Every structure is written in structure tokens, then in C-alpha cells.
Amino acid sequence: LLLVLKTGKVSFFQLRLKKYSLKNKILIGKKIKRICKNYNVKLIINDDPFLTKILNADGCHLGQNDINILEAKKIIKNKIIGITCHNSIRLARIAIKNKADYLAFGAFFPTRTKNAKYTATTKVLNTVKKLTKTPLIAIGGINNLNYKNLLLNKANFLAISSYIWNNKKYKPLEAIKKIR
């Protein structure tokens, strides 16, 4: 993680600890937060505004089955809140109305990180970009061979997981260096 963040190519790090106890989430979260802070990387907690508050993380990412954004704002106040919109312009409009700080769309490509029920297209990114200045995040199966098209089609940020952390061909540092 240190070497990857040291490259300066990571603006946000999302911590996903679905199968851990709260105690372990806090222990791991504190260590990750310190590393992120050292490299000016914002720490985003997946699905859990309570953990976001406990860790005083920079923000929280909410899926469609997580706590409502308005409830999350009561818990974490002015922290960053991003919303998964899958491939839906309707969900994006709701998130925009509720003042989400970013909108995440995907999966754009097959992914091993989680079971993707939805496939997003660059058409969705282009359509939503006309509706808002809210940053758009592309997620799902992104790698060194397919990322440029997403950036050309209005994605402000890329959420990349398996390509960096579970790559059979490249170590994390090698993988991230291939994303220019």
C-alpha cells in the first residue's frame, strides 16, 4: 500500500472490510488512515458511516442497499459521501438531488471483486455528465488496457481494485505504473 500511494496516482483509497469484526475494522482502519494521511490520499469507508465517524475518515461510499444518504449525512456531517448508481440515470438524479459528493457507475467490465448485477456503459457517463458537475467514478474490471476510454468518456476518477491488488501478472506497484 505504501509503495502504491507513494506513486501519487491515488487520490482516494476505499476501505472495504465486509467480513471483519468492528474491533478489527477499527484497528485496520486506523493503520490505513495513517498511511493515507502521509500521502495526502483521502480515506473512504465502504458502506459504513458509523465506522467513518469512529475513524474520522474523509468520507463514506454508500451502495443502494446501505443507509440512506440523508441519514448518513446526519452521522458524518460534512464528510464526503459517494453513491453507487450502477447504470441508472434515475438513481443518479436522486443522488444529485440529495447532494452526493460523487456518483459511482459500474461495472463497466467483468470483475472478480464482487458479483456485478449491472453493466454500465460510457453512454450513461456522458448522459449524467450533462446533468451535473458532480464527479463521476467508473468501477468494475478496470485495468491498464481499458481505462483510457472511461476517462475519454467523462469519468473523473477510476475505482480500480483487482487489477492492482489481485493481479496474477503484476505486483501492485508494477500494475499502477501501467495506468498513466
Residue map of PLM features:
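Catalytic domains of carbohydrate-active enzymes, especially glycoside hydrolases
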Residues: 3-16, 98
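N-terminal active-site wall of soluble small-molecule enzyme domains
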Residues: 12-75
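Conserved beta-strand positions in the central sheet of alpha/beta enzyme cores
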Residues: 12-14, 44, 61, 82, ...
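Short secondary-structure boundary segments
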Residues: 17, 64, 85-87, 107-108, ...
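Alpha-helix-loop-beta-strand connector modules within alpha/beta enzyme cores
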Residues: 26-45, 71-88, 116-144, 178-179
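Glycine-rich phosphate-binding active-site loops on the catalytic face of alpha/beta enzymes
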Residues: 62-72, 104-116, 147-179
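Histidine/lysine/aspartate-rich catalytic loop segments that bind and position anionic ligands
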Residues: 82, 86-114
